[in-house]
Amino acid sequence: MINLKIGDKAPDFALKDAEGKTVKLSDFKGKKVVLYFYPKDDTSGCTKEACNFRDNLDALKKLNVEVLGVSNDDEASHKKFAEKYSLPFRLLADADKKVSREYRVYELKNMYGKEYYGITRSTFVIDENGKIQQIYYKVKAEEHINEIMAEFKK
């Protein structure tokens, strides 16, 4: 598998959201999409990142931008997370890690000297035609929303 680059066609996928409905990236043709991958529901960094997207969602929607969050958690976990923090955008369950691997964000990580596999916090901005407009890799949860908002104000 090759790493994705700016200008590449974003790989399409079909994943279930918190309500069990199938969501495809191709459903959003004609809109820009912020596709953000995060490690785990209801953990401190992931909660900050999700709440920052929530708090800026109106501004993003005015710019014809959809936000989709993806983690390896299941639909039930996403439902609890979304309800707890009033997250108005879709969280998608990549429990089999297929999409995370395809986007090259599921990889070997190291925390406190312990190695494990998981999602590296990353975001793909996808244009109206399904092409990758920008890639943010290994982002800082607290500050990432500023990068995203700046991307759409160019």
Range-by-range predicted roles:
Residues 1-154:
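Chalcogenol-based redox active-site neighborhoods
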